[in-house]
């Protein structure tokens, strides 16, 4: 009888041990799943931001590093840096239907900033900068076509545009863009966290 009782207790102890192991495995699995889920959210936010502004991995990392050193919210500064790129400003002004198209305008020297040709798409614009089109027939024909394609309904509040003629737009930067004027629905802090955890 004692031997049978001992066997029952041994089996019960083994079952409890197995149950404990299963619970432990489930806990580890849930923890891993949660970590993976958080990582995938950060990765998705980073990819969306890259796609939206058409920047490379290296460029985005550089902007994150600059934003971390600046005063204010790192996420907000990051968005401001991306929004104030020349190619993005041209797109927001409605001078190109896409950011890649705006980048091409800059690369091909069709755009002037404060009456100087700028051929660097990542050029950081600042308040009071004036964006115009080169006084060249090809440049003006491109802009005329782009304006028809872009069909911008509303210019963001940090920008302004006027037309001396249909082919001679004049863009003006009123101020640094604020978060409310950025139409992108994204949690920029997830992007900052993504790069913080990669370091």
Swiss-Prot record:
It is found in: Plastid, Chloroplast. Disulfide bonds: none annotated. Residues 1-24 have a biased composition (Basic and acidic residues). Signal peptide: none annotated. Residues 1-35 are annotated as: Disordered. It comes from the Eukaryota. Residues 84-146 form the S4 RNA-binding domain. One of its GO terms (molecular function) is rRNA binding. GO terms for biological process: ribosomal small subunit biogenesis; translation. PROSITE patterns: RIBOSOMAL_S4 (PS00632), S4 (PS50889). Keywords: Chloroplast, Plastid, Ribonucleoprotein, Ribosomal protein, RNA-binding, rRNA-binding. GO terms for cellular component: chloroplast; small ribosomal subunit. InterPro entries: Ribosomal_uS4, Ribosomal_uS4_bac-type, Ribosomal_uS4_CS, Ribosomal_uS4_N, S4_RNA-bd, S4_RNA-bd_sf. One of the primary rRNA binding proteins, it binds directly to 16S rRNA where it nucleates assembly of the body of the 30S subunit. Belongs to the universal ribosomal protein uS4 family. PANTHER family: 30S 40S RIBOSOMAL PROTEIN, SMALL RIBOSOMAL SUBUNIT PROTEIN US4M. Part of the 30S ribosomal subunit. Contacts protein S5. The interaction surface between S4 and S5 is involved in control of translational fidelity. This is Small ribosomal subunit protein uS4c. The gene is rps4.
